[in-house]
Amino acid sequence: MARGSNNSRPGLSTLGYPGPSVLAREGALLTTHLWQKLTADTSAPRYSFGTLRAVTPTATLRRIRPLLRAAGITRLADVTGLDWIGLPVFQAIRPNSRVLTVSQGKGLTRAQGQVSALMEALEGFHTEEIPQRSVRETVGTMRRRLAYDPYALPLARPSFLSDTVPLDWVPATDLWSGAASWVPRQLCELNACVEDRLYVPLFRASSNGLASGNTVGEALIHGLCEVLERDCCGRYSEARFDPERCVVRDSALPRLAQRLLGLLSRAGMQTRIVDLSGPTGLPCFEVWLDHPDGPALTQGSGCHPNRLTALVRAVTEAVQSRLAYISGSRDDIPRHVYRDSMAPSVVGSLRRKSAEARRHFRDAPTVRATRFSPQLRDVVGRVRSFTGMSPVAVDLARPDFGIPVVFVLAPGLVLTDAQ
């Protein structure tokens, strides 16, 4: 369960933050440092092999390698050879992590896989101790200051959240207006260390929305797309095997996607691609891999404004999931997950219902943009139109590391396990 904090945190008035009347009068136009960095970000995708990044993976590796020791990352393991497929998958080991000691990464090249694993480990390091000073206020008090409903955040089941509950809140940024906002610290500080005190179930804390990037805009798009991905998977979890939503593997697929499916086929994989694009109109895909010799039925999903990037992410994540099972090194895969994923009823349902797939890749939406900031603006606007609330982000960047790391929350979107 997410950690709490002591009662010594100051309130808003103690720290000199404006009250509700001032915010209402000024239209909450207080912008944040994160927003200033975003508005100054003119970066554009310069690397586009299955992904869209501001610089090449090799350049990112040069930037982050000097930081690994300070973050406690002791090893980068290549686990690609444990499977038959051959797509690069790496694991970054951080023994003193307060949540997961093993972070995974995947890609179409070795450099992509290495960057993916190392950046995930660095993200975990950044979220264990949030640098911003928090304030302590009740939910009811904060509701009058916020442009979103705290009850629309991911809640525990059951949740004892009420207006009288005091919480620690950290500064955040409204991604539509740039206005200063607040989010519960419990949601974005991931620390599973056990303390000698009781924590009442309130929120469902997870790494969903935690993201990094070469630039602020790149990191924010990554985080928001991850939140949307989980929303799409949860929203259509009951209909994931609906043949009407399956993508036909035909000539309409881009060449890169055909090459990936050919690689999987040569490894003996049965592949099913499901179009889960949700009400925001962003492309989201779910990919299922099955092999007669196991180890299990595995799934991967991906969401991105560019539909090819979304599909590539789903495929590579499914491959990564297989290696998570095979390597057996993840702290978050208990024995029952292995058992359930190999249940004949699950595998049979997938094979039977996917046989009639008839949806085409070209039917999935796609969004084009030349720079990260306008692309983010478009995605934020779509979420805001659907939920009636703007996504918010916490700036987790540390001056001594210099890497853009953010935690994105989108009140009103669904957070449900895809399993």
What is each stretch, according to the model?
Residues 2-419:
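Helix-biased "structured C-terminal domain" signature
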